[in-house]
Structure formats: structure tokens, C-alpha cells
UniProtKB/Swiss-Prot annotation:
Region (Interaction with PHLDB2) residue spans: 1251-1535
Organism of this sequence: Mus musculus
Gene Ontology CC: cell cortex; centrosome; Golgi apparatus; kinetochore; microtubule; microtubule cytoskeleton; spindle
Modified residues (Phosphoserine): 246, 545, 548, 558-559, 568, 600, 636, 646-647, 649, 684, 688, 695, 702, 711, 784, 794, 820, 1088, 1110, 1193, 1220
Family designation: Belongs to the CLASP family.
Classification of source organism: Eukaryota, Metazoa, Chordata, Craniata, Vertebrata
Name the UniProt record assigns to this protein: CLIP-associating protein 1
Database matches in InterPro entries: ARM-like (IPR011989), ARM-type_fold (IPR016024), CLASP_N_dom (IPR024395), HEAT_type_2 (IPR021133), TOG (IPR034085), XMAP215_CLASP_TOG (IPR048491)
Phosphothreonine modification, residue list: 656, 708, 1092, 1096
Record bears the keyword Manganese: no
Compositionally skewed regions (Low complexity) per UniProt: 252-266, 280-290, 548-567, 579-594, 612-633, 673-695, 1103-1112
Signal sequence, renumbered to the chain: none
Keyword DNA damage assigned: no
GO biological process, one term: establishment of spindle orientation
Segments of this protein annotated with the region Localization to kinetochores: 1253-1535
Amino acid sequence: MEPRMESCLAQVLQKDVGKRLQVGQELIDYFSDRQKSADLEHDQTLLDKLVDGLATSWVNSSNYKVVLLGMDILSALVTRLQDRFKAQIGTVLPSLIDRLGDAKDSVREQDQTLLLKIMDQAANPQYVWDRMLGGFKHKNFRTREGICLCLIATLNASGAQTLTLSKIVPHICNLLGDPNSQVRDAAINSLVEIYRHVGERVRADLSKKGLPQSRLNVIFTKFDEVQKSGNMIQSANEKNFDDEDSVDGNRPSSASSSSSKAPSSSRRNVNLGTTRRLMSSSLGSKSSAAKEGAGAVDEEDFIKAFDDVPVVQIYSSRDLEESINKIREILSDDKHDWEQRVNALKKIRSLLLAGAAEYDNFFQHLRLLDGAFKLSAKDLRSQVVREACITLGHLSSVLGNKFDHGAEAIMPTIFNLIPNSAKIMATSGVVAVRLIIRHTHIPRLIPVITSNCTSKSVAVRRRCFEFLDLLLQEWQTHSLERHISVLAETIKKGIHDADSEARIEARKCYWGFHSHFSREAEHLYHTLESSYQKALQSHLKNSDSIVSLPQSDRSSSSSQESLNRPLSAKRSPTGSTASRGSTVSTKSVSTTGSLQRSRSDIDVNAAASAKSKVSSSSGSPAFSSAAALPPGSYASLGRIRTRRQSSGSTTNVASTPDSRGRSRAKVVSQSQRSRSANPAGAGSRSSSPGKLLGSGLAGGSSRGPPVTPSSEKRSKIPRSQGCSRETSPNRIGLARSSRIPRPSMSQGCSRDTSRESSRDTSPARGFTPLDRFGLGQSGRIPGSVNAMRVLSTSTDLEAAVADALKKPVRRRYEPYGMYSDDDANSDASSVCSERSYGSRNGGIPHYLRQTEDVAEVLNHCASSNWSERKEGLLGLQNLLKSQRTLSRVELKRLCEIFTRMFADPHSKRVFSMFLETLVDFIIIHKDDLQDWLFVLLTQLLKKMGADLLGSVQAKVQKALDVTRDSFPFDQQFNILMRFIVDQTQTPNLKVKVAILKYIESLARQMDPTDFVNSSETRLAVSRIITWTTEPKSSDVRKAAQIVLISLFELNTPEFTMLLGALPKTFQDGATKLLHNHLKNSSNTGVGSPSNTIGRTPSRHPSSRTSPLTSPTNCSHGGLSPSRLWGWSADGLSKPPPPFSQPNSIPTAPSHKTLRRSYSPSMLDYDTENLNSEEIYSSLRGVTEAIEKFSFRSQEDLNEPIKRDGKKDCDIVSRDGGAASPATEGRGGSEIEGGRMALDNKTSLLNTQPPRAFPGPRAREYNPYPYSDTINTYDKTALKEAVFDDDMEQLRDVPIDHSDLVADLLKELSNHNERVEERKGALLELLKITREDSLGVWEEHFKTILLLLLETLGDKDHSIRALALRVLREILRNQPARFKNYAELTIMKTLEAHKDSHKEVVRAAEEAASTLASSIHPEQCIKVLCPIIQTADYPINLAAIKMQTKVVERITKESLLQLLVDIIPGLLQGYDNTESSVRKASVFCLVAIYSVIGEDLKPHLAQLTGSKMKLLNLYIKRAQTTNSNSSSSSDVSTHS
């Protein structure tokens, strides 16, 4: 036996850490076995060496695992030796005291446990404490704190009778002045615990200690709180302590004397837990505050303070507004006395209690208080911070989700309080966050919390994981869905956190996360290293199935704490009373009979072991720790959450789970992800026993009509209804007569129970077992239930929820916001999710959903988080489908959001849904979107050139088709023309093809009158002509040719005139194309019916009356050549109807083929009787006419007045006949009966161009006018430089200048190429700007401006400088033209100040100076103010200098009005780090003073004394240098 003991000693004394870890468990087993270690008690020397080795080498090891093993071995020795271990206490105590200050929480806790065990089994507590008193003066603050905690634990475990407290209290009093706050807090808690056991004598004795009165007050307040709580141990036995007995006297107190009158109640049977648990449980309801230490507050303190405010009354909304404005004024200025600020915060609570939330304007004013709340939360006065936190908590608890904006705004500020060393501030912040998390379930709070989980502060990280755990316990699953990935990533980081307590909290979070999203949790689990996986499992095991306890009772301490928890933790969000807790759970077990459930939301296999015998596939064994628990254990009960009870949701027992234990409802979106891993409960939020399908009717009564067989046939789908996690009432055919009650807390659920009782937490309200329906086993369920087919129409949905339509009418037709405190109106409500109700193609009955707040939907759409944008789009779809029209302001904001969404990077997730929403939006609001059409059309066309998935591209095409059919054709056409010539756009080949195809399809539907020969049209047509020779793409070439032919066919006369105005090269290209087209079409020899096939009839057939008249006499019904060309199917014998039958000509190709091919040979003309000679003569006529027209059009341009005089002379008859003016001398030719449409075209080209258009437009033709409707559109919608001819009139333009400018523009469009040529072009343009060529500017100004601004980004600095010089010259000569482009020009000019080349900067400064003197002062200042406030150096400097020049031009009255906008930016500039910016700001202020004088002074109140002195100095200097000063206070005034 002797050698065995020596070998143990050798193993203990070895230094190798690995071997120690191996032999540790063996030593424990050896010492625990009395037979093997019989020699342990015989050799005292060996035992001494053994214990000494354990104490010095193991317990003092640097490896915490060795330390824990050493303690376990000592614990085994204590158990083995009992009181014989007393001799070793002196050996081990120094090491154990040191370990009380260990950095590892697990080491400290095990150390406490071992010490308590020694006191319990080896020696009496006083013996041990006599040797531990030195720990109160230990150099490690954690050790000093640990000693206090150990004392508390000893008092709880052994009682006060076993200790001579008179020896200990002085040491505790010394620690009250400890430099470390945690030690001070622990000391106070120790005194409180002594008071709890001993009674009032402690108060009297402490008064004799000479402690500072402030410290005594804090301690005595704690004493009073404990006394009021009813947790006193010795209150009944206080008479046993004589007056002369003292806990601090020279002789032992009666509590510690052996002859104590109080009976010694043995407390050794108390289960030994961690010190923190013992402490928190013993202090009852004050546990959290006591745990935090002196000055700390908890939720109960907050709840008491909610009502502890003066009573006020609100008489009107005006009264409320005035009160809040006063409060805001006080809170926004920290110069007010702190007591005033505290009273103001209390008054907010008073207003809330007086019913402020019932007033409409309250929430508007509440938003304005955000800044004041932030300031209060940052206050240096702890009392102000405390009141601010209490007020925020009160707002959250009263307003619920309506406090979303305030909560989101203030949360980051509150987080900054957590690491504060002042406990009152830190704990106030913590409690405020907890209250907000409990009551305001806004998904936007999740990123705020998760971002702080990676804080550098350990305290913040710990708290954040606590908050996350609370959030996962309290919130509904749908509120978490959009942040699944963020939550998983945060929990993963927490599990790897450097701090042990943070890791523990993160592991709790993991299991909370698992209860919501089992699949993601399993995925996360498998990504962890094995050691972390073991830690997660051990956390579950060590918690003694505490994870599976009902949520209302889950805590880190004994059940006493949960009984004494603050009321707020137990009440429902609506303020109802405490939940029924575990008693309900117990009752429900008996009620449900055999339906005892396992913890299936943790264990994916648990459903298989439940009594319902549901077959399911096996999940990961890693999560099966709860599966083996007996049916009657806590784990077999449903999880009753305080805030998430299921009052009877139905679960499809037979839904087939996948390998991850989740129902395979594939069409269900992410928003329908199951909270439970249990296949049988995959659609539900809670695991309450009453949740199984067999549950019958609430109260036993049927609430809806039986489901008919037809509807039953359509509803075999695991589709949620209203509640995105609940299954359909009629998924199982047998439940057809039941109306399954659902928890009213889940979004979109039926309101069959009243609002007052909607939070009923009973898990079993009259549910019956499955056997009642014969559904005890899954085999009895029809196989068709598992088919899981998808509902595709709204009728399916209506049938599936026929009973839901019986809900009270009151709830269906409520206006917005009436019940927005209800969860169904939260921004995360599953009513937002269309997929949570029906398939994408299915309609959603709008009366089945609570409509969402439009502002909330728009906020989601504008979010930077893609999942929130997706949620917003779903909400918007619901709004649009419910025929909810948007206001003008909402429309404007939504258009801005949609404009940004065109560039959304999440194409599959968000952009696809955006396109679907866009189509609905266009259809409903097309009449209000005219101003946004340019952006819509151009962005969609750009998207056609992007690399998109086929499905997404199809949606873009659909959006284009809807756009084409929804807006006026002429407006679309003009936008496309403008887009083509826009120099800022560089469309790729795909975009070009998309544009051309769109124009071609548009041309087939346009009226001839819609084609307008404007400058943009001519420029666009010339560009399209160049595209017909695109070398890189045959698709572009073909599409461009088809567009030219389509436009020619659309309005031959006007298009011919347009060609005549183009340069010769363009004419030749187009004429050649048209010749070939006509030649090819004539060679086909078919009388093409494409007049009705290749061309889609106009939406207004009645307006097809010929828009042009010819001087010729039509012998066939007076039909115009244009009409003959475009619409004749039967030759000239009769005008055909718009929709001729394609089968009128048997040899014609099929309708479908012709429509698809867009073949030029199939366009609209009739060649039935043409021979080749006539064709070529006609072609020659067309060519000659174009050439002649190019000269005539120039003559016409020189006679604008004459043309106007002719305007009324052209008379157009309804049948297409015309009376030509007598003065018209140009060759009108007669058309004989045998001549064809082509000759009519030729003859038309030989006539005088001017014609009056009939119908709505009633305008004459001229080559340069632009559509009036488009002008209006441009002014209102397009701030950027687009081609707006609002000032366009006919001018006398010399032909050489027009051609020259066109060539220059073409040259300038070669960006970053041909540097020398472009320099020459810019110099030439510089000359033209100095000449008085008004016509050039009328036609080309916008194109020139755009090209110049684009050239400012050129690679060559000399080009950039030259462009600025040209721009400056145009500003000098044409200032009025910049009115609509001021913002763009100013921005580009100011940005040029950042250039690295001095030459460019100098040119930019000159241009800015000219801008300041050219543009209207008020307009200029409105553009400059935001730039000054937001831009960085040097742009802000240039803007301030420019503003200074503008101020010198402005009138006093105008400047006074704009002062509110100007001053903030200048004051900001006065504080700038750049001295030049500060100087410029001062000069600008001086210039303002020169204009308005002393009126400036009130706006400078924020300036410090030194800055005011400096400003006054400059003002005086300016006054003295200006001899023309009108007065001492006004240096100069400018009108």
C-alpha cells in the first residue's frame, strides 16, 4: 500500500502540465475510493507533502485547467478526510485566498465552493474565517471582493450563529473606502447580508464607527430596502439580542456565542451554488441592484419611479404642445440648473400618465425630443442621467413599438453609460436598455446591440450578450428574421470572446437563438471547433435543464430569485398581471394526457420520443441532450414564455421534415422560418403542450363554419395563415370544424379573443388529445396532407381561411394607427411579408391584414440593410394591392428611393422584388409619375444592358412594357431622344439595342402627330444614323436601321424634313438605307398586310386622321399620303379599318412571325401594283426632294414671321383633303388614279413644309420647336442638365455656325482622346461664345454645357482648365441661361478646386467668381449653404469665398430672410481646422455685417468672446478702409 501513496505523491509533484491533466481524474478516483486509499490516513507526513504539493503546484498553477483539477482533488480529500482535513486548512488557505482573485470566473466560483465545503465538513466556519481575515487586505482587488462574496455565501450557508462577526465587521468597514468600486460594492453587500441575519444592532454599531455620513446613508438605505422586502432572517428573533450585546463589542455577540438564545438552525443542507447565485437569491427582489453594488438601480426602482411624478392635466393638444416645447427648451440647454432638467424629465412621465399618447401631435413632438434625450443621457449629473433613463424606460413600456424611432436614436448613447464607473449611471443605462428590449420590439435595434458586442470594453460586451439573451427570450421570431445572419455571427464571436463571462452569456444566447432558428443554430454549431461545441453542450447540461424551464422562471439563480423578480419581468407588454408560470405548465401536462412533449426546440430528435409517436427524420445528435429526459420532467413540458405564449396554435403532425428537422415548405420565404427545430411543431412559435394538432376548440366551441370538401381539397399545404409561423387551420382534414385560437401576440393573428385577454398565457385552454380525432399516429393522416402543394390564387387562400373572415368587422376597417400599439402594426409584423401568407403569384385579400404605416414602409425601403429593404418592398406591395394611394409627398420620397434602388447590389434578393413592386406602382400611380418618367425609363433601359439573370431581365422587360403602355407616347419619345443625345450617358451595346427596340415598339404605337422635329430629335436621329454603322455589334446596326425605317413610316413628311436639316453625310446614310429598304420591299412582290401586323394600332385610332396635308388632290377618299403609307391594306380603293384581318392575303406570313421578326420588308406600305420602273422613279423623287428640302428648310428658318403668318392658312379637313394657300407656289403635283402611295410621298416632299396639325396638338410644323408638355416636365423634374428647350424659339442662325458647333460638339465628345484636336475645338468654342450668335445658344446651350462639365473630369489638366475658361466666358455672355442649371454648374466648379494642378484651380476660382456675379444671388446662396455645411476642404473654402461675393450683391431684405441658412455654415467654418477656412468665414461674416449691420449680432450668440473680438476687429478694419461708409455700423450696402 505504501508504494501506491508514494506514487500518488510523485504524480502530484511532477511539473508536466499534460501529465497532470491526465492523472488528475485518476487521483480523484483514487482518493474517493476508501479501499484503494486506506493508507491515506496512516502516514501524516506523506499527506502533508501531498496537500502542500496540491496547494502550491496545482492550485497556484498558471494553467486554469490544472487549478480546477487541483481544487477537485482537494475537494475529494475533504470529502474523504472530513474533520481530519482540519490540520491541512492552514496549508491550503493562502492558495485558495489567492485564487479568489483569479481572472477566470470558473476558478473563482469553484474556489468559493471549496471554501464553503471546508467550512461545512472539515472545520467550523469561524475557524476558517479566523485564518482568512488577511484576505480583506489582499493586494488583488478581486480577492478583496471575493472575500466579501465568500462571507455572504457563508452567512447564507451556515447562518450568523456560527461566526464571530465582531472580528469581521471592522475589516469590512475598511473596505468601504477601497479605491475599487467593485470592492466597495461587495463590502456594502456584506454589511447588508449581516444586517439581514443580525438585525437593527448592526445599524447602531455602524453609527459608532465614524464612517462618513454620506456612506452611512447609502448603507442605511439598503438596510431599509431589505427590511421592507420582508427578507429579514432574524426579524422574529431580534428580542434574543440584549442591548449590551454587540456585533462590534469586545465580547462575542449573542449571535455567535455558544449559549445563544436563538436556536441554531442548521443551514448546512443548503445546496451549494455559486456565490453570486446565493447572494442574488438571498437579497430577493433587490438582487440585481445589490449585485451591481452601491448606488445601483434595478427595474423595480424604475417601475416605482414611473409613477413617482407630479400629477398634471392636459386640456388640449395646444396645451400639450406648449408643455413639450418648454421641456425641450430646458433639456436642450445644459446651462439650465440640473434640478430643472430633472423636473422636466419627470414632467414627460407626468404627461404620459395624463394621456399624452392619445393626442395626435404627441409623437411628432416626441421625435423632436430625441436630441434632448441624448444630451440628458450624456449629462455629467448622475441624477439627470438616471431620470433620463427612467423616462426612456417609461416611454418604451407605455408606447411599445410606437417608441421605435426614439429607441433607435437613443440606444447608442445609453450604451456609452454601461462602462461608466459611477454605478448609478451604468445600471440606469442597463435597466433602460432592458426595458426598451422588453417593450419595443423593433428589428432596427438588433444591429445597435450586435455592433456593441464587439466593443473594446469588457463590461459593454458582457452586457450586450445579456441584452441579446433577453431579446431572444422576449421577442417574437418574425422580429428577428431579417437579422439572422447578424445574430449568428455575433453569437459566434461571443462564443470565442476573450472574456469568460461574455462567453457564458453568448452560450446562453446560442440556445435562445436555437429556439428561434434551429437550422441556422445547427449550422453555426457545426462551424465551431470541437472544444466550443463541448462548451455549448456542457452549458446545457450544467444548467440542470434550466434552458428547458419555462421562460418566466428561467434565471441564473435558484427559484427564489424568480419568485422575487421585479414585476416588470412578469407582466405582459400591455401591462397585464403576472403570467401563470410553471403551475400552468404542470396543469397542462395533466390536461393533455398522453401528449407530454419533449424539448423539441432544442433537440431535433425530441419529437420522435414524444408520446404522440410522430415519425420524423433524425437531426444532429449534438442537440439531443434533452431527449433522454423523462416525460414528466421539466424538459417534457412546453416552454412557457412570459411574452411569447401560444394559446393554442395548431401544428401539422405529419409535415415531412428535412434532414435538419424542419418542415419542407419550400415556397415559404425566409420570413416563415420555423422557430422550433421540432418537425411536428415547425410552424409554431412556442412548444406549449396545447400546441399539437389535436387541440380542439377554445372553450370547446366552434368559431367558424366547417371547411367544405372543395376547400379542403385545395388546402393541403403547410402554409401559414396570418401568423407566419402558424400552420393552416385546415391543413389536416379532420380539423375542418375547428377554429384554432392563435396567440394574439403573433402578428396578423385573428382577434377572436378580446384585447384584454389576448395575452392569456395558458398553454392548454380546452385542448383535447389527438386520439379524440383518431390521430394518435401519423399513419392515420392521409398521405395527401404531405403533398405540400402551393396555394397559387387568392381564392385558395380565402377558402383556407374562411373562418378567419368571421373576425369582428371593427378590426378590419380601422384607419391607420388606431391600434398601432398592437404587435400587428409593428414594422416587423409578418403582415409585411406577402410570402408568409400566400405565394408570390397569389393575391392577398387586403382585409386579412393589418395595413402598415406608410412612413414605416418607406423607411424600410430606404434602409441600408438589404433585408429591411426587402421587407419594405413587401409592405409596399401590400399597400399597393390594398389600393392605398400615396400622397404627393409620399410619392416624391418613394420615387427618390426607387431611383436609388435601380442600383441595388442585391439583384436576386431585392432588385427582383423591386421590379415587381415597381410594376404595381406604375399601374396605380401612372398619372402622378410624369415628372419621374425620365428617370424610370432611362434606368430601366440601362438595366437591360446589365448582366442580369434571365428571370430578372424578364421582369425589367415587363416593367418597360408596362411603362410604355402607361405614359403618353410623345413624352416617352422625347425622353428617349434626349437620352440618346445626352453626353453624360455612355450606353453600352446592349443598352443601345434596348433603346432602339423600345423606340421601334413605341413608333409602332405612336400617332404621327407624336413625332416632333425638335433639336434633340434631329441630334438623336443623327446619332441613330451613326449607329447603323456600329462596327462592334450587328444587333445595334440592325436595330438602328429598323428604327429609322419605323420613324420614316410613322410620319414620312416630317421625318423627311428632319433629314433635310441634317448635314449631308447623315442625309446620304439615311437616304441610302431608305432606298435599300424600299427596293427590298418592292422585290418581295407581296401586298404586305403588315400595316396591321408590323405596326401595333394606336391607342387612339380616332386620332389617326392625317396629321399632314398635301397640296395634291387625292382621288381616293382624300386620304393623306401618310395614311396611305401607313395604313392601306387594300391599295387605294378604300381606306382600311385600323384592324385589318391578317388573313386577307393568303400568302402573307403568319401574324406571330411578322410581329417577332420586325423585318423592314414587312413595314407599312402597299406595293400591290408597283412595277420596278415606277419604284425607281419614286426613289429618285425622294432623293431629289430631300436635297431640295435641305435648301428650302434654311430659307424657311430665315422667315419665321412669315411662317407664323401662314399658320392659319392651312385648312385641314376631317377626311384628309386640304386647301393649300394661294401663295404657295412650290410644285404641287396631281396624283392620278393609278399612282401609288410611294409617289404620294415623293409629291409631298415637293411641297411647302409648313403645315398645321389637327387634333390635340394643333401646331404647325417647324424644324426646331420642342414639345411644350416636355418643357413643363423638365422644369419640375429634371434638375440635372437635360435637353430642355424651354427658351427655344426660331432664330436667325447662320449656317456656318450651326455646322461648326455641331462639329465642335462631336469633337468634344471624344473624352480622354485626341487632346490637341479637343483643345482646338475648345478654343474655337471660346471664340463663338464671344460672338452674338443667339441661335447657336438657343439650340446647343444644354449640349455645350453638359460637354463642358463632363470635360472637367478629363485626364489632361490643360483641357480641364480650358473647359473652365469656356464655361466662364459663357457665364459672362449668357448668364440667364444658367437659371435651371445653377446647382449643377456650381457643384462642378467647386469640385474643380480639388484639382492637383494650379492652372485648373486658378481657372476654377475665376469661374466661381464669375458664377457669383452672374447667377441670381438668392438662388446662388441656397445652393451654397448646404455645400458649406457638408463639404470638406477645399470645396468649403471655395464655397465660402463665392458666398462672400454673392453677399456683396444681395439686398438687405433678401439677406435677412436667408440668414438662418447662411450663419450655421459660417459658424461651423469659423471652427474649422484649416486657418484659410476660418479666415474666409470671418470675411463672409464681415460682408454680411456690411449689408445688414447690427441685425447680425443675435445670430452670433454661440461665438466665444475671443472669436467675437476678432470679428469686431475685422469689421472695424473694413469700416475704416471704406471711406464711403454710410454709417459706423454699415460699411456698404448692395442692392
